[in-house]
C-alpha cells in the first residue's frame, strides 16, 4: 500500500508540473511573438519585453528548483518514515513536513 500512495502522489506532482509547463510556454510564446512583431519596433518596448522575459524565466526556474528540492526532501522523508516506523500513510507525514518548512 505504501507504493500505491507513493505512485499516486507522484502522478499528481507530475501532472502539476505538466500544467506549469503548459502555462510557461503559453506565456513565453506570447512574449516572444510580441518581441519580434512589426508593431513592436521601438527600442523601449523591446528592452521592456526583454526584461519581462528574463523576469518570467527567473520566476519559473526558481519555481522549478523549489519543487525539485521539495520532491527530493519528500522522497527521502517518505522512505525514512516508512522504513523507520512502518506506517502506511506516509503522505500525512509529508504534509506535516511541508507545514514544518
Curated annotation (Swiss-Prot):
Task: Tell whether NAD is among the UniProt keywords.
Answer: yes
Enzyme Commission (EC) number:
7.1.1.2
Which keywords has UniProt assigned to this entry? Electron transport, Membrane, Mitochondrion, Mitochondrion inner membrane, NAD, Respiratory chain, Translocase, Transmembrane, Transmembrane helix, Transport, Ubiquinone
Give its localization.
Mitochondrion inner membrane
Bilayer-crossing residues are 12-32, 48-68, 79-99
Q: What GO molecular function annotations does the UniProt record carry, in alphabetical order?
A: NADH dehydrogenase (ubiquinone) activity
Q: How does it sit in the membrane?
A: Multi-pass membrane protein
User: Any keyword Transport?
Assistant: yes
- Catalytic function, reaction form: a ubiquinone + NADH + 5 H(+)(in) = a ubiquinol + NAD(+) + 4 H(+)(out)
Described by its record, this protein's role is as follows: Core subunit of the mitochondrial membrane respiratory chain NADH dehydrogenase (Complex I) that is believed to belong to the minimal assembly required for catalysis. Complex I functions in the transfer of electrons from NADH to the respiratory chain. The immediate electron acceptor for the enzyme is believed to be ubiquinone.
User: Belongs to which family?
Assistant: Belongs to the complex I subunit 5 family.
* Name listed for the protein in its UniProt record: NADH-ubiquinone oxidoreductase chain 5
Organism lineage string: Eukaryota, Discoba, Euglenozoa, Kinetoplastea, Metakinetoplastina
Amino acid at each position: 500500500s505504501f507504493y500505491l500512495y507513493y505512485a499516486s502522489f507522484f502522478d499528481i506532482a507530475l501532472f502539476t508540473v505538466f500544467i506549469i509547463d503548459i502555462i510557461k510556454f503559453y506565456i513565453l510564446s506570447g512574449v516572444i511573438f510580441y518581441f519580434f512583431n512589426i508593431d513592436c519596433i521601438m527600442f523601449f518596448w523591446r528592452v521592456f519585453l526583454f526584461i519581462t522575459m528574463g523576469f518570467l524565466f527567473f520566476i519559473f526556474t526558481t519555481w522549478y528548483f523549489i519543487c525539485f528540492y521539495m520532491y527530493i526532501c519528500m522522497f527521502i522523508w517518505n522512505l525514512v518514515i516508512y522504513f523507520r516506523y512502518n506506517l502506511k500513510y506516509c503522505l500525512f507525514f509529508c504534509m506535516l513536513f511541508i507545514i514544518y518548512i
